[in-house]
Amino acid sequence: MTDYSKTVNLLESPFPMRGNLAKCEPAWLKSWYEQKRYQKLREIAKGRPKFILHDGPPYANGDIHIGHAVNKILKDIIIRSKTQAGFDAPYVPGWDCHGLPIEVMVEKLHGKDMPKARFRELCREYAAEQIARQKKDFIRLGVLGDWDNPYLTMDFKTEADTVRMLGEIYKSGYLYRGAKPVQFCLDCGSSLAEAEVEYKDKVSPAIDVAYPFKDTVALAAAFGLAGIEGKAFAVIWTTTPWTLPASQAVSAGADVVYQLIDTPKGKLVLAKDLAEGALKRYGFSDGIAILAETTGDKLENLHMNHPFLERDIPMLNGEHVTTDAGTGLVHTAPAHGLEDYAVCNKYGIELYNPVNAEGKYISETPRVAGMSVWEANPVILQWPEETGNLLASSKIEHSYAHCWRHKTPLIYRATGQWFVGMDKAGSDGKTLRDKAIKAVDDTEFFPPWGRARLESMIEGRPDWVVSRQRYWGTPMTFFVHKETGELHPNSAELLEKVAQRIEEKGIEAWFSLDKSELLSAEDCEHYDKLPDTMDVWFDSGSTHYSVVKQREELEWPADLYLEGSDQHRGWFQSSMLTGCASSMGRAPYKQLLTHGFVVDQNGRKMSKSIGNVVAPQEVYNEFGADILRLWAASTDYSGELAISKEILKRVTESYRRIRNTLSFLFANLSDFNPIEDAVPQAEMVEIDRYALVLARRLQERLAGGYYPRYAFHFAVKDIVSFCSEDLGAFYLDILKDRLYTTKADSRARRSAQTALYHITRSLVLLIAPILCFTGEEAWDIIGGGEEDSVLFHTWHEFPAINEKAEAELVKKWTAIREAREAVTAAIEPLRADKTVGSSLQAEAEITAPEEMAGYLNALGEELRFALLVSKAEVKVGDELAVAAKASDGEKCERCWHYTRDVGAVAGYETVCKRCAENVGGEGETRHYA
């Protein structure tokens, strides 16, 4: 008896269904590194148009977390897809190396008692250790880049170029020194940049304090009254009692309506809209009378006494005054608030600051000298109470600025700092704010809402405090006049001389510099080196100049910056400002892409205390990095990205669908040589030509749309749908009969293999930017061998087909697919009640509208192959309808179709006539399916 299983083309796949990614990926990485794939790619891509994604440097401290992984994976997908699109897309990874967190860690490890040069040396060593750890993890994620030559903000050349960027901004006229209130962290002992501030709830005392008017005659006139009997008070409300010793004025809103109210305390001035609530706080319900009303502009330049100090307090008009809460009058301490500073500056009031750099009151401050501002709060609360000027006291929970590192409350404190001015006219007559807002207009945003967010932040941001009183940072290499505080007139030339020294020896070249090496003897008497370092956001914000503009393989401006949504106030903004404030005069990027933060499946932030942290190291060790990459790509990054073990298991199912599809494709291509066996498109079976159209359209959607627009979640959805619907549930399902049962080298089978070859090459290229390990594993089989890489190739080129023929082909097969779905649905009840096992056991009678019926009948005897039934008949009717029944034919042992011609050919008693021809004759021919 013949064993017909040996006559079918069931081939083993060289691409296993189990990926075993966690085990295989490290070995592949080692091999790629040894082959110098990144370097080879640079040679291959030489001369192509450039695409530059500039890496926002992660901070060199601690292991990478899942947010880092998302960021680097998204960048890598872009670099790979741009490379395959025909660009030269080098990727230079970087690290942010200076700053307080490293200082804190070094102090923990080694203490504080050491020479500053040794301290900086230890900071440099610590940063290098952290970089080595993080680099290993980034490489493990499959991120392609120049890992042997990354940029570090602590590289001598980068430090030197950061100093040069400072020189650029100095020459542009935006740098100035001022004693302004800035966000100050008592734990850091330093001012903070806007990006280093976070807001969380804090409970604070809320008090109403009365300021006695000096001249009630002038007050009466402001309210249009002939006179006022008794005492009168302006009442303020504040949640920062510790600032009252620095109170130098009270601000009223020029257009706000104020009432003069007679109360048991005396005459009180309160905003009309807030008076009722204020009087309730003071417990005044009886003996109240509204005497008059006026607007805030009439109160300007009235004078009061301080509620507990001997100090004259003028009434000012301030635009910052609102009637949202409080009393409508604002106690004004220019040393402790930006708006306070601005209004006092307008009136020429000289700033008084009673709080030192440790957050303690100076010795001249009565009662609270030597106390920290937080210790002093209860003492200061007693003070106006003793003078009879405390009207109400309570607690309030409100959003308050905290240090992002120490999580402790900040204070506004006036300090001598260096600023980049937002509204100061530069050497070109333009303000930095105007330039930056124009630069926002010239930038493309992904997602689009990023534009409004960045624009509003730039519109509202204060001047940028760029100086820091720290040790581990790029120095502000200026010489400052000892008496006037002015910069040396030759600062630009001196900066360049210092930069040249730093390029040779690093920042220590400045810290160890004797000023006599660069200044004349006379200048040495009058000028000192500035001891400040630069804000680390200036370091990273200057990398477009220190890295992108300097490295030969890169081009300025970068095409794309890609970071988390917090970087609108961080790196995106600092880079924008340095770009606009320098001679470049524009943003250093053309596009900005923002991704959300990673949360758990319930939308909660990752937290060790909750126990919901998903570490990337755990994911790639258990599932493989390709699963993590597929998760990142399949999630809409414009919002929060949810991750958990359950979510990763679902992602694994999608991966399995793609992998199983590839395994099937490779199995059926294992005896196919595209040079010798390919069938010209015009001679291919019709459904094979249709499948090529589907594959080409998929490639067009991804290569022409989703990848260039960074819509990776749509790309993944489309790939999985193509594998499961177009291939798995339709084309490959139909194709199995022809692949397995026709002669191995028949035109019918070679036509199918020709289609599969094009589909497979295209599919591997399409998945490779996302599934970089799986893509390379597959390319080893269908590409040019082990030394070849999928990255060395651009998108697949399909055989050409004219538009009219394609449109007709798609229309026809769309109708056939619709009919097939109806047939499948009609057979389902027969399967459910065990009348038939598979659809091949059934016959179908189809009623269809005329056009569809024409398409179906055009397939002739091959219609049954397209519908996966043993027999199909078609007749014309108004609507699509299918009647299915069990076939009365006999099952062919070889093809499993049920026919009435099993055993019709002598010597082939258990197989159908078609199979007999395929085994012993010339083989069947196919035209349609």
Curated annotation (Swiss-Prot):
Extract the Pfam families matched here: Anticodon_1, tRNA-synt_1, zf-FPG_IleRS
Record field: transmembrane: none
Signal peptide residues are none
The UniProt entry's GO biological process terms, in alphabetical order, are: isoleucyl-tRNA aminoacylation
Fetch the SUPFAM superfamilies from UniProt. Anticodon-binding domain of a subclass of class I aminoacyl-tRNA synthetases, Nucleotidylyl transferase, ValRS/IleRS/LeuRS editing domain
CDD domains membership: Anticodon_Ia_Ile_BEm (cd07960)
Quote the record's binding site residues for L-isoleucyl-5'-AMP. 563
> One GO molecular function term?
zinc ion binding
Q: Which residues bind Zn(2+)?
A: 892, 895, 912, 915
Q: What chemistry does it catalyse, as a reaction equation?
A: tRNA(Ile) + L-isoleucine + ATP = L-isoleucyl-tRNA(Ile) + AMP + diphosphate
Intervals of motif 'HIGH' region: 58-68
Q: What is its EC number?
A: 6.1.1.5
Main subcellular localization, coarse class?
Answer: cytoplasm
Q: Which cofactor does it need?
A: Zn(2+)
Record's keyword annotation contains Cell inner membrane? no
Q: How is the cofactor bound?
A: Binds 1 zinc ion per subunit.
| Protein residues bound to ATP | 608
- Outline the subunit composition: Monomer.
Spell out the HAMAP family in the cross-references.
Ile_tRNA_synth_type1
**Comment text on domains:** IleRS has two distinct active sites: one for aminoacylation and one for editing. The misactivated valine is translocated from the active site to the editing site, which sterically excludes the correctly activated isoleucine. The single editing site contains two valyl binding pockets, one specific for each substrate (Val-AMP or Val-tRNA(Ile)).
Identify the NCBIfam families for this entry: ileS
UniProt record similarity statement: Belongs to the class-I aminoacyl-tRNA synthetase family. IleS type 1 subfamily.
**Full protein name:** Isoleucine--tRNA ligase
Which species does the entry assign this protein to? Neisseria gonorrhoeae (strain NCCP11945)
Lineage of this protein's species? Bacteria, Pseudomonadati, Pseudomonadota, Betaproteobacteria, Neisseriales
Q: Which gene encodes it?
A: ileS
